Amino acid sequence: SAKDVKFGDSARSMMIAGVNVIAD
């Protein structure tokens, strides 16, 4: 569903943000 896609995008964005924080 569209909700699932939005949730997936949010989770991916949070994961990427976490990786960026660790990289810093």
From Swiss-Prot:
Keyword flag ATP-binding: yes
Location(s) in or outside the cell: Cytoplasm
Major localization listed first in the record, in broad terms: cytoplasm
Induction context: By heat shock and ethanol.
Keywords carried by this UniProt record: ATP-binding, Chaperone, Cytoplasm, Isomerase, Nucleotide-binding, Stress response
GO molecular function annotations of the record: ATP binding; isomerase activity
Parts of the chain that traverse the membrane: none
Entry GO CC: cytoplasm
Catalytic activity entry: ATP + H2O + a folded polypeptide = ADP + phosphate + an unfolded polypeptide
Enzyme Commission number(s): 5.6.1.7
Family: Belongs to the chaperonin (HSP60) family.
Subunit description: Forms a cylinder of 14 subunits composed of two heptameric rings stacked back-to-back. Interacts with the co-chaperonin GroES.
UniProt function note: Together with its co-chaperonin GroES, plays an essential role in assisting protein folding. The GroEL-GroES system forms a nano-cage that allows encapsulation of the non-native substrate proteins and provides a physical environment optimized to promote and accelerate protein folding.
Protein name: Chaperonin GroEL
Taxonomic source organism: Acinetobacter calcoaceticus
